[in-house]
UniProtKB/Swiss-Prot annotation:
GO terms classed as biological process: carboxylic acid biosynthetic process
Protein name stated in the entry: Branched-chain-amino-acid aminotransferase-like protein 2
GO MF term list: catalytic activity
Species of provenance: Arabidopsis thaliana (Mouse-ear cress)
Coiled-coil residues: none
Family statement drawn from the similarity comment of this UniProt entry: Belongs to the class-IV pyridoxal-phosphate-dependent aminotransferase family.
Matching InterPro entries: Aminotrans_IV (IPR001544), Aminotransferase-like (IPR036038), BCAT-like_C (IPR043132), BCAT-like_N (IPR043131), Class-IV_PLP-Dep_Aminotrnsfr (IPR050571), P-loop_NTPase (IPR027417)
């Protein structure tokens, strides 16, 4: 006989699920076989305690060996367990043998239901024990399947089919319906807990609208919800109130699935890296940011990026801004914790911070700024060998009359609208013109061109004066090319000998076609290649060292 263990918190539809499995012709079920041992060991009081202790086996070791794993008449045995009933000292085979899965339910739905029967507490809900069960099973090399009670209610057949697949047992349609009333396998506590279930004949549809949440449980909800979310993020099929929820996509760099990010004043795992819905970046894109690259244990142009971040924050009148040293420490700690010392890009963001209430006014921002350090394994995002293709967007670059591009702000809709045009054209990026029709930059980068050995780039009146742009301009002079900064028409770019773009994310990227016109010979030109080499030499040899890098510099790169 194969034993199936179902672990859950109370009021999670665990008994409903037990009724479902009891309808199968190949399974016998046990209703909380460890309950009496739990009550005897802990001294927890229940109105039926004395009767329970007199009728059920109270010795946990005997329960495991003689009842849970004892002989049976059917192919499978389904054991419904409440997580807190897994006591210390129980035989190890309880967890090491059989098949296990975890049933979770949002504490928002558990707490109002639980209170009707018994006073709720963190211990009574048992979510901490449920996380511990998951962790122990993972350490044994047998991570359990996780299903959500809310999804079980919304689509019982699909959820049960998926669960049966995980348990490697055939699905039976009989699991979806049963006769009203008790079943012989009910625990003797059924009159206290199962009244509603006894009126059912199957999985009831979830209520369209939830109950009003009792504020007396607000603190308990704050304690329990993170544990529920820890388990929920390990579900294969996450439940959602939105029918349009998409399956999880693949990542461009799979190693980034398990990165750590700095948010506020702490480092947290990727799935926990979130800001408040009251944060100004959510309320209005009210934030500034920088992109930085890491080369061979050094942060390239760190001081220049921090200068611009500070200038942008000052231009937007941010208050309670972290100090320069605090920002550096957050950057270094994030990189070191992730083991990222090369081939890494950082998205450094500073929001105006959380508001006391929703609204536009910065007067509502009374918590101080929110610092975010998002470091990812990320090679240059463009094809810097074969070249990229651009189109010209109909969306014009913001004028300083409206929003000064010298403020490196997070309100990027102007750029995003142009990027949508390039996506629709199936090319890499879009050139954006200023209000008079001259080239400003692309949606993501600054832009340069070569004509008769002269290097030209648009002036910075309508574009972000990029740090990579400034670096390349210095290299142009050092490489003894003539540099000219002026207004440049689109037709001049169409007829250029060479074109390239610059940015921290993509470095120096050759452009081989614009609006269907081949640039030069349609490949990387000699000036572009020479400047690429000079840029690589510069990034290899300069930057602010990351503390501790010398200790690990001989390790192989992670990607």
């Amino acid at each position: 006989m194969e034993v199936i263990h179902a672990w859950s918190a109370p009021r999670s539809l665990s008994t409903t699920l037990m009724y479902s499995f009891a309808q199968r012709d190949d399974i016998e079920v046990l209703d909380e076989p460890l309950y009496a041992a739990f009550l005897k060991s802990t001294g927890v009081d229940r109105p039926y305690k004395d009767e329970l202790l007199s009728k059920m086996e109270c010795d946990g070791e005997k329960v495991v060996k003689d009842i849970i794993y004892g002989p049976g008449k059917k192919k499978y045995r389904f054991c419904k367990h409440i997580s807190k009933q897994r006591l210390l000292g129980l035989p190890s085979e309880l967890m090491s043998e059989g098949k296990h899965f975890i049933l979770i339910r949002n504490p928002l739905n558990i707490l109002p239901s639980f209170e009707k029967i018994h006073p709720s507490s963190f211990h009574e809900l048992g979510l901490g024990e449920l996380v511990s069960i998951y962790s122990d099973l993972c350490q044994m090399g047998t991570p359990p399947a996780i299903i959500d009670a809310d999804e079980l209610q919304r689509d019982p057949e699909a959820t049960l089919r998926s669960l049966c697949d995980d348990l490697e047992i055939p699905f039976q349609a009989s699991m979806l319906k049963w006769e009203a009333g008790p079943i012989p396998e009910d625990g003797l506590w059924a009159p206290w807990w199962y009244e509603t279930l006894h009126k059912s004949t199957g999985f009831s549809s979830p209520q369209k609208y939830p109950q009003t949440f009792p504020l007396m449980h607000y603190d308990l909800l704050e304690q329990c919800l993170p544990l529920y979310n820890i388990l929920r993020c390990h579900m294969k099929h996450k439940s959602s109130l939105l029918s349009s929820t998409l399956p999880p996509p693949s990542l461009p760099v799979p190693e980034n699935a398990k990165l750590l990010a700095w948010v506020g004043d702490e480092i947290v795992p990727r799935e926990m890296a979130k800001v408040s819905v009251f944060d100004s970046v959510v309320q209005g894109g009210d934030s500034v940011w920088e992109g930085l690259r890491i080369y061979k244990g050094k942060v390239f142009k760190l001081e220049e990026h921090l200068d611009r971040l500070s200038d942008s924050a000052k231009a937007l009148a941010f208050n309670n801004v972290p100090t320069r040293e605090e920002i550096k420490e957050a950057i270094f700690r994030t990189l070191i914790t992730n083991g990222m010392f090369d081939n890494t890009h950082i998205r450094l963001s500073l929001t105006r911070g959380k508001k006391v209430t929703s609204g536009m006014s910065p007067a509502f921002n009374r918590y101080g700024c929110t610092l975010i350090v998002l470091a990812e394994w990320k090679p240059p995002v463009y094809d810097n060998d074969g070249g990229i293709v651009l189109v010209t967007a109909t969306t014009r670059r913001n004028s300083p009359n409206n929003l000064d591009s010298k403020i490196h702000h997070n309100n990027l809709l102007n750029n995003i609208l142009a990027k949508i045009e390039s996506n629709n054209a199936n090319v890499d990026d879009a050139i954006m013109l200023d209000k008079d029709g001259f080239v400003s930059e692309t949606n993501a980068t600054n832009i340069f061109m070569v004509k008769k050995d002269r290097v030209l780039t648009p002036h910075a009146d309508y574009c972000l004066p990029g740090i990579t742009r400034a670096t390349v301009m210095e290299l142009v002079v050092k490489e003894n090319f003539i540099l000219e900064e002026r207004r440049i028409s689109l037709s001049e770019f169409h007829t250029a000998d060479e074109v390239w773009t610059t940015g921290t994310m993509g470095e120096l990227s050759p452009v081989v076609k614009i609006d269907g016109r081949v640039i030069g010979e349609g490949k990387v030109g000699p000036v572009t290649r020479r400047l690429q080499n000079a840029y690589k030499k510069l990034t290899d040899g300069s930057g602010v060292p990351i503390p501790t890098y010398q200790e690990v510099k001989n390790l192989e790169p992670c990607v």
